[in-house]
A protein has these predicted regions:
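A polyanion-binding, active-site-adjacent surface
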Residues: 1-169
Length: 169
């Protein structure tokens, strides 16, 4: 895609990966340097943290569909603009339609913006279950943030437990 300028600074687009009919879809903000180099979603230390969180719920990575709101990394890891998010919106919408997950875990503010078109603070969005194309959306903190802010891991775990309860319902 060359819909916005992000394509110029990336090595490759990170489209998504995982089970084609997964119950869980995890949507991150944007690929980072680790993902751009590896060519996979949620790579590096943040990916390892996400894998551990999912394993704690009994979910191997292979049973989850992983993607990002943006398909290209942003320069220096800066936050995405609303225009950049809008350029990738159709890809994300199509992924949700194809996978048909039972729950979407939106990990980060950009992921929440892409799915919910909301500019509310992440702390407020994570307090209630939202919806995208009829699929419940649980908003939580991104793994890279949790690596820097250990105190919020308990909140993220609570959010994952809410998502798990929606899948089991």
């Amino acid at each position: 895609c060359t819909g916005c300028g992000l394509c110029q600074g990336r090595q490759q687009a990170i489209l998504g990966e995982g089970a084609a009919t997964a119950d869980w879809m995890v949507v991150g903000d944007a690929p980072g340097e680790d993902e751009d180099k590896a060519g996979t979603s949620f790579a590096g230390p943040a990916g390892q943290l996400l894998d551990n969180m999912l394993k704690a719920l009994g979910l191997p990575r292979s049973e989850v569909y992983l993607t990002h709101a943006l398909k290209c990394r942003t320069p220096s890891g800066r936050s995405a603009s609303a225009v950049e998010v809008s350029h990738c919106a159709s890809y994300l919408s199509r992924q949700v339609a194809l996978v048909q997950p039972k729950v979407i875990l939106a990990m980060g503010r950009t992921a929440a913006l892409a799915l919910l078109q909301s500019t509310e603070p992440l702390g407020k969005l994570r307090s209630e279950v939202q919806s995208f194309q009829g699929v419940p959306v649980v908003v939580t903190y991104p793994p890279a943030y949790l690596l820097r802010n250990q105190a919020d891991k308990a909140k993220a775990w609570a959010d994952l437990c809410v998502a798990a309860s929606l899948v089991q319902a």
